[in-house]
Amino acid sequence: MNQQKKQAPVELKVGQTFPLTIKRLGINGEGVGYFKKKVVFVPGALPGEEVVVQATKVQPKFSEGRIKKIRKASEHRVAPPCPVYEQCGGCQLQHLAYSQQLREKRDIVIQSLERHTKFKVENMEIKETIGMDNPWNYRNKSQFQIGRSQSGSIIAGLYGLDSHDIVPIKDCIVQHPATNKTTGIVRRILEDFNVSVYNERKRKGDVRTIVTRVGFETGEVQVVLVTAKETLPHKEEIVKAIQKRLPEVKSIIQNVNGAKTSVIFGEKTKQLAGKTVIQEVLGDVSFELSARAFFQLNPEQTVKLYDEVKKAAQLTGKEKVVDAYCGVGTIGMWVADGAKEVRGMDVIKESIDDAKKNAKKHGMANATYVTGTAEHWLPKWTKEGFRPDVVIVDPPRTGCDSTFLDTIKKVKPKRFVYVSCNPSTLAKDLQTLSKDYRVDYIQPVDMFPQTAHVEAVARLVLKSSN
């Protein structure tokens, strides 16, 4: 019998060029298209564009490529204003007009729901993304690696895209100007004293990183020098030079990190001069920020985010509220004036100490904070007669712990407010809760303009059958 041979599918090879139409943006800001029904990720490509792509990586389930030529450009494509945008890995969307960034971020939330849930997404209320009037100079903290240029001078910047070569940055346009100014002057001071720069490959040298944080409302600046060893030659002279040339610096700290790691901070922190903290104000609440304290990086958008949390909680003054994964207590304190009682917990003792201090300083007698997990405290409090009406959660990128979600299903608060920094884990967690809770709406918030990140506030309401 003369059987017809089945044609083998066309396989892509690394280096091959091929045409591609970009259908959407991926969760990391890359363009997504399909070649012979296989997904292809192309950094820098935008939805609606027709491009010629060269394959850089070919896997069984997906491929990656780079743009060789744009045949038809998106009407939303703009020239990125940053001179090192192509080399630096910090921003992903400067080449996309800001109004369209906001639309695409809403779409990323929708895509995550379509991929990870069984919801009829077309019937859900996914609100327009809340953006910024000026989507630049918004970051209150910079962490610039220190290295040496080919000519031998000290440089400060970020690691390049997919590399461990430092891209020198003099004026990062998403950073607050005070952090740029401070980092630049500290870099020159280190050069004046010919400080030894840490070499990652050889694991030798002294200074690794300059970390700068500014209080937007107070103008106070903190400088942290991350060193590989406890000894820092010319320490006193460096401190004096910083104080003389940067009077706005109120806190100078040394952090010691000798480990072979990409994590910035080590465990040991030493005060070199000034205060151990700087002050920052959000709305009517002020905070003391130590070198390693977590604090939102975009104060202007944080106020909008927390106002959305308050709106979603719908407080009347009678509710018992739990702030899970509470950190230094920011969200709980933001909503405390509308609640009967707020209780927060976190596994990091230092954060809880800060939360207690912050609540006491503001005279919030209705806010209490404890160390431990929500899985431990929620059932215990419920047994003791404290049944929360509202639970607010702001988990890390990995989403909520499954035991925490099981606890929510048992305790059954009337309202559950989920603050997410990762649409994929948000969608998965909403699906897990879908038997007991309906999603009232989701409000995306743009905390990091020019990047692919999107935050969202989801309001869940207990189903009446419960």
Curated annotation (Swiss-Prot):
Annotated TRAM domain residues: 11-69
Molecular function in Gene Ontology: 4 iron, 4 sulfur cluster binding; metal ion binding; rRNA (uridine-C5-)-methyltransferase activity
Active site positions: C421
EC number assigned by the record: 2.1.1.-
Highest taxon, organism lineage: Bacteria
Record-linked InterPro entries: MeTrfase_TrmA_AS, MeTrfase_TrmA_CS, NA-bd_OB-fold, SAM-dependent_MTases_sf, TRAM_dom, U5_MeTrfase_fam
Broadest EC class assigned to this enzyme: transferase
Biological process, per Gene Ontology: rRNA base methylation
Record: residues binding [4Fe-4S] cluster: C82, C88, C91, C172
UniProt-listed PANTHER family: PTHR11061:SF45, RNA M5U METHYLTRANSFERASE (PTHR11061)
Family stated for the protein in its record: Belongs to the class I-like SAM-binding methyltransferase superfamily. RNA M5U methyltransferase family.
Name of the featured protein: Uncharacterized RNA methyltransferase YfjO
Gene: yfjO
